[in-house]
Amino acid sequence: MAYIFDTNVFIRSKHEMPMDLWPTFWKKVAGMINSGDVFSSIQVKGEIDKGGDELTDWMKDNAPVGFYVENEPDVMVKYGEVMNWAQSNTVYRPEAISEFAQVADAYLVATAAAKGYALVTNEIADPTCKRRVKIPDACNALGVRYCGLNDVLRELRITI
């Protein structure tokens, strides 16, 4: 199984496992990326690049061509399905749907659905949340598997 990583997985890892203190962890992440087990969305690249920090530099050094999945036609078809689901869900406020459409989240769900990836995120499902569309809720609606980083490490039998 291949995995697609949410921006928050990289950012939270940067904060909780700084590169200077956890070099083995970051080498293992680079190994997962280079083995073709892990991908991300081109929208995630944009979000990480905005940071302009050591994570931005690390990603430039470790993300090979093809790591960031482009918004190909199959992804855009699924993106339409994701957005139709969000817009038809009466729980969400209009600003929540607008934000969901503009950040990487909807594209991540669409890419996972189109490519058969499991989506890796730190978010937790909350189908009653009005102010934000949560990735796990969108995954559940589209039948996409989601999990956390530790699940991926276990499934790929990676230890630090």
Language model regions located:
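Active-site neighborhoods of divalent-metal-dependent phosphate/nucleic-acid chemistry enzymes
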Residues: 74-136
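Acidic, PIN/NYN-like endoribonuclease modules and their adjacent C-terminal/linker elements
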Residues: 118, 124-160
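Exposed alpha-helical structural elements
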Residues: 21-24, 28, 54-58, 74-81, ...
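Residue-level detector of structured alpha->beta connecting loops
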Residues: 37, 113-116, 143
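Short, surface-exposed acidic-centric catalytic microdomains
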Residues: 44-85
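Short, well-structured N-terminal submotif of metal-dependent ribonuclease cores
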Residues: 1-61
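Conserved beta-strand scaffold positions in the cores of enzyme catalytic domains, especially
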Residues: 38, 66-69, 146
